[in-house]
Amino acid sequence: FFGLGADGTVGANKNSIKIIAEETENHGQGYFVYDSKKSGAATVSHLRFGPRPIRSPHLITKATFVACHQPQFIDKFDLLGPAVEGATFLLNTSEPREKAFDSLPLEMQEAMIRKRIRFFVIDAYRVAKDSGMGGRINTVMQTAFFAISGVLPKDEAIAAIKHAIEKTYGKKGEALVRRNFEAVDASLAHLHEVEVPQAPTTTRRRPPVVS
């Protein structure tokens, strides 16, 4: 999960690990990498879960799910490098569904075609703004992850997310909880799968990637 220090991505992923551990038979672990000047700097959250206890934290090199919470990152990082064949890629973008694939640099398009990656998009900032959440897209992206990952049945996942919201924000007032609930429900309506074509649709290459 690629995010920014101020967008709530790390906090949402910590909540996701708790939900997975509490609601399934799986063990979960999070490993978080971010700049010391966290606010405004890139963060990368590595989530692992499975039926056996996970002992040692490390970076994920074979990912079945990759999420980009900030659209500008498509030109800054090799987001799909760790993705395995058949992985799922979730992108926060303001591009309409029919133009989302075209907006990607050539390297990403080629990787998606070669690895047969499933592609989902959501305009998380629009959903957050319309729900009264400002720029905090964490709830929106967390909902999208659970909706398409299959870690939990969707209805169970939504109920678990809302329960976590009540625990996290309940003391801050009913209005904040309600706004988060609205963001969860709106996320499902604004999440779309994009058909990946058989050939690239651009010649635009990504600038040199930041390692």
Annotate each language-model stretch with its function.
Residues 2-211:
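Active-site cofactor/cluster-binding pocket
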